[in-house]
């Protein structure tokens, strides 16, 4: 059987291997202030209602390599309830009424937006403009216009 590996294929494969390090984004390697693949990812929770109380202890808190750096809810009664009911490592000084202040102070890599549907587009839009990755559940917004 004839060898199907030609000089052309060899040069193409070698060229790709040489060029790959030049085109891989620095963020993948953990440079420019973003976390690398093996570093802890800092996240924040926005909206501390029933959905958060359901998801946080089961799905978010147990994830290895994930650190909750702050929580935000404009309703202080809900924040108090979060700290009373949820076993967590957070301190009350990491709780913010204004999520923008929390993002500015704590500098999370991403947020979990568990707000009411009518608030999601606004909250996630601002968080993304501030440089955060966003986890959001459906529906993302109420109308097509709101999502644009």
Question: What is each PLM-predicted segment?
Answer:
Residues 140-148:
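Rossmann-fold NAD(P)-binding glycine/threonine-rich loop
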Residues 48, 139-140:
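Active-site loop/turn elements of alpha/beta-hydrolase fold enzymes
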Residues 1-133, 145:
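N-terminal glycine-/serine-/threonine-rich beta1-alpha1-beta2 phosphate-ribose binding loop
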């Amino acid at each position: 059987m004839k060898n199907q590996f030609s000089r052309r294929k060899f040069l193409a494969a070698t060229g790709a291997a040489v060029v790959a390090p030049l085109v891989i984004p620095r963020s993948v390697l953990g440079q420019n202030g973003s976390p690398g693949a093996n570093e802890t990812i800092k996240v924040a929770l926005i909206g501390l209602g029933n959905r958060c109380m359901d998801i946080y202890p089961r799905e978010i808190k147990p994830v290895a390599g994930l650190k909750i750096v702050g929580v935000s809810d404009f309703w202080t009664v809900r924040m108090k309830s979060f700290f009373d009911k949820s076993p967590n490592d957070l301190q009350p000084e990491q709780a913010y009424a204004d999520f923008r202040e929390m993002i500015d102070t704590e500098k999370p890599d991403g947020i979990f937006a568990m707000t009411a549907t009518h608030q999601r587009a606004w909250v996630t839009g601002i968080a993304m403009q501030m440089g955060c990755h966003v986890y959001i559940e459906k529906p993302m917004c109420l109308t097509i216009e709101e999502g644009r």
